[in-house]
Amino acid sequence: MSAIFNFCAGPAMLPPAVMQKAQKELLNWNGLGISVMEISHRSKEFIALTEQAEADLRALMEIPSNYHVLFMHGGGRGQFSAVVNNFLGNDGRALYLVDGSWSKAAAEEAEKLVGKANIDSIELVSAVNCLNRVTLPDLSKIDKDYRYVHYCPNETVDGIEIFDDINSPWPVIADMSSNILSRKIDVSQFGLIYAGAQKNIGPSGLSIVIVRDDMLALPSLPQSSIMDYRLAVENDSMYNTPPTFAWYLAAEVFAWLKCVGGVTEMEKLNIEKARRLYECIDELDFYVSGVAKENRSRMNITFQLTNSQLDSQFLAEAQAAGLVALKGHRSVGGMRASLYNAMPLAGVDALVGFMRAFAAKNA
């Protein structure tokens, strides 16, 4: 069978080496004669797995000792409400920086929970010469008191990524669901980082939360116990039964990432993958990117065909060539190629080759 390259925005492809290992030990994990899906989450074998997973993630991201690492339910949307309920209390206010669909959704969820009067938002994206460009505000000039500032550094729908740090007098909370582990960051610049697993970590159903000690002292609102960060810390992410198979696969992805050189080497590869695809888009008049170069996402590359009537043909022929899940989000249309960590350079080269051939044939 010819190679299939999966460009889905999420759930996304997992490293083949991880999938093959999971397949091999599915019915007999760790020599126990049963699957990792079947053992108690409180068994010494599974506890050892969770401890290694946390240690590997801490090493990969250089997480300081004053941060807790939590493995939780709910994905990114679950964290939209968890952040509000854990930190705003009865009188807290928060600022949301909106650079695309997911940061907008987070702000709307916050407004629903505590009212618009307690949530401020700033739109970061404007169209300049038909290109979407991000302008970061000077937060030091805002004469208000916020519990936190929330933003999403990579917007999967819009193909926008913010590479600059957010300089804020208030704790910064980041939704890194789609670019965690794709490039080096300074974790100490954040009060909290959260990420749904289904893009760069593992399958859906799991979310990672990295929270600084002092954030847990902020007043909270009544909420579901399974989304309470303090309870999660006190119970080592096992207040209730966790998504064990997703946790196991996340542990395997972390181990794989360490084996291939860690985040430093992965960032180099991601830069090269994105460079090759954007170079193709820019060279050919057949395709167009709607994002300014300094804000183009490395993870989710959005583009349009100049003749949109060819969209269906492009997708059908790409699928036949083993290049799947290239259709853009329904809200924006066009195409989207998601180049998460597991996507090999060969997949990008195959896509670029197809795009050049398709353009030549249909120009």
UniProtKB/Swiss-Prot annotation:
Its main location: cytoplasm. Gene3D superfamilies: Aspartate Aminotransferase, domain 1 (3.90.1150.10), Type I PLP-dependent aspartate aminotransferase-like (Major domain) (3.40.640.10). Its cofactor is pyridoxal 5'-phosphate. Keywords: Amino-acid biosynthesis, Aminotransferase, Cytoplasm, Pyridoxal phosphate, Pyridoxine biosynthesis, Serine biosynthesis, Transferase. Pathway: Amino-acid biosynthesis; L-serine biosynthesis; L-serine from 3-phospho-D-glycerate: step 2/3; Cofactor biosynthesis; pyridoxine 5'-phosphate biosynthesis; pyridoxine 5'-phosphate from D-erythrose 4-phosphate: step 3/5. GO terms for biological process: L-serine biosynthetic process; pyridoxine biosynthetic process. The keyword Transferase applies. It comes from the Bacteria. It is found in: Cytoplasm. It is an enzyme of class 2 (transferase). It catalyses: O-phospho-L-serine + 2-oxoglutarate = 3-phosphooxypyruvate + L-glutamate; 4-(phosphooxy)-L-threonine + 2-oxoglutarate = (R)-3-hydroxy-2-oxo-4-phosphooxybutanoate + L-glutamate. This is Phosphoserine aminotransferase. It comes from Shewanella pealeana (strain ATCC 700345 / ANG-SQ1). The gene is serC.
